[in-house]
A protein has these predicted regions:
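A positional/architectural concept
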Residues: 3-44, 49
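Short, low-complexity cationic-aromatic patches
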Residues: 7-17, 82-91, 145
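Short, structured motif recognition centered on aromatic/hydrophobic residues
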Residues: 14-18, 47, 89-93, 97, ...
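Short active-site loop/helix that positions an aromatic residue
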Residues: 25-27, 96-100
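A short beta-strand-loop micro-motif that forms or neighbors metal/cofactor-
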Residues: 28-43, 102-119, 123, 136
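A low-complexity, Ser/Thr/Gly/Pro-enriched, surface-exposed linker/loop concept
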Residues: 42-45, 49-67
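Short, solvent-exposed interaction modules
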Residues: 60-91, 97-98
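Acidic/histidine-enriched, glycine/proline-rich intrinsically disordered or flexible terminal extensions
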Residues: 131-148
């Protein structure tokens, strides 16, 4: 289970040092094998391989006849990269994915249960500001009556 927010720096070889609390979960669930892919929100998604496999299976089973479905499948499956976390707990992010998410030195990791989102720091701050600006009138129906 991934939760919490952490800001980390990419090293000189564009490797992401995975925080210990996430690293342990990745080692237990997938032996350090991860899949990193693009997200329509212009961040990256990092999954332990066992969590990604059923998602990929569902995605590849979708029909290509609907253009929106096909585009989403192309994005998520097309950008997916299998990556092995090294013994120091680092993940090498491919240039194509770094460019897609506009990742530079500082990367924000956001735990989301079964996955971790990787954000450009400025884009993450804008995302948080947008979330704080929502009024209760604009809540989706599935959140009505939801309490913390």
């Amino acid at each position: 289970m991934f939760r919490g927010v952490a800001t980390v720096s990419l090293d000189s070889k564009n490797r992401l040092v995975v925080p210990a609390r996430y690293r342990d979960a990745l080692l237990v669930n997938g032996a350090g094998r991860v899949v990193v892919t693009a997200d329509p929100g212009q961040c990256l998604l990092l999954y332990p391989l066992p969590e990604w496999e059923p998602i990929e299976k569902k995605l590849t089973a979708l029909s290509d006849f609907n253009p929106r479905t096909r585009s989403l499948k192309q994005l998520l499956v097309g950008y997916a990269h299998d990556i092995d976390m090294d013994s120091a707990g680092r993940v090498l992010l491919p240039p194509m994915l770094r460019k897609f998410a506009e990742l530079d030195k500082n990367v924000v990791l956001v735990g989301q249960g079964s996955k971790v989102e990787l954000w450009n720091e400025a884009r993450w701050e804008a995302q948080v500001a947008q979330a704080l600006s929502f009024s209760s009138d604009a809540l989706p129906s599935e959140l009505e009556g939801f309490t913390l």
